[in-house]
């Protein structure tokens, strides 16, 4: 695991364009376009321009890390991102249920 840990604040109202997302992930824009076209990374298209929410940035970074660290193909990287997102959702549900049972 890398000693360089990046912390980010998610701002749901802010979106990134294709080049901003690619730059934030340290990948070429073609990397992003390939994954969008394959249905592995979602985007919002307004007036023909790709826009990415903060959740898309988190997913893209996970996919980049998985591809680089484990020499995984894009489909495996997307599956790993799906599983991480599912675990996070389940943890939120367990936490919410625990709060309700205490209160």
What are these regions (language model features)?
Residues 2-23, 29-33, 37-103:
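Arg/Lys-rich, alpha-helical DNA-contact motif
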């Amino acid at each position: 695991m890398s000693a360089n840990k990046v912390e980010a604040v998610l701002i749901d109202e802010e979106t990134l364009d294709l080049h901003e997302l690619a730059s934030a992930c340290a990948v070429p824009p073609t990397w992003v376009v390939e994954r969008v076209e394959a249905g592995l990374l979602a985007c919002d298209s307004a007036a023909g321009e790709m826009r990415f929410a903060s959740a898309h940035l988190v997913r893209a970074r996970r996919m980049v890390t998985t591809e680089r660290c484990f020499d995984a193909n894009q489909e495996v990287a997307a599956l790993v991102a799906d599983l991480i997102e599912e675990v996070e959702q389940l943890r939120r549900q367990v936490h919410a249920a625990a709060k309700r049972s205490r209160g």
